[in-house]
Amino acid sequence: MNVGDRVRVKESVVVYHHPDHRNQAFDLKDAEGEIAAILTEWNGKPISANFPYLVSFSNKFRAHLRDFELEVI
C-alpha cells in the first residue's frame, strides 16, 4: 500500500471521533478512503507506529489504522 491508494476497511474497527457520530461508537467496516500518509519517522527519527496508516475518509474525518484492517480497492 502506498500514499494515494484507495482502500476499504475490511475489519470491524470502532471509533469514537467520527464528526457525525461524536462520542458514540461508530464502526468503520466497509468504509472507503484514501491513504494520506504512512508514518515511519517523526522529526527525522525512525518510529515504529502501532497504527502507521493515516486514512482520509472525508475532509473532516481521518483515522490511523493497521495494515491488516485495510484492503486496496
Swiss-Prot record:
InterPro entries, A to Z? Elect_transpt_acc-like_dom_sf (IPR008990), Fd_thioredoxin_Rdtase_alpha (IPR004207), FTRV (IPR044166)
Q: Does the keyword Oxidoreductase apply?
A: yes
Job description of the protein: Variable subunit of the ferredoxin-thioredoxin reductase (FTR), which catalyzes the two-electron reduction of thioredoxins by the electrons provided by reduced ferredoxin.
One GO term in the molecular function aspect is:
oxidoreductase activity
Q: What is the species listed in this Swiss-Prot or TrEMBL entry?
A: Synechococcus sp. (strain ATCC 27144 / PCC 6301 / SAUG 1402/1)
Family that this chain belongs to? Belongs to the ferredoxin thioredoxin reductase alpha subunit family.
Name the segments for region: Interaction with ferredoxin.
43-46
- Oxidoreductase among the record's keywords? yes
Q: Which Pfam families match?
A: FeThRed_A
Q: What is this protein called?
A: Ferredoxin-thioredoxin reductase, variable chain
Q: Which UniProt keywords apply?
A: Oxidoreductase
GO annotation, biological process: photosynthesis
Q: How does it assemble?
A: Heterodimer of subunit A (variable subunit) and subunit B (catalytic subunit). Heterodimeric FTR forms a complex with ferredoxin and thioredoxin.
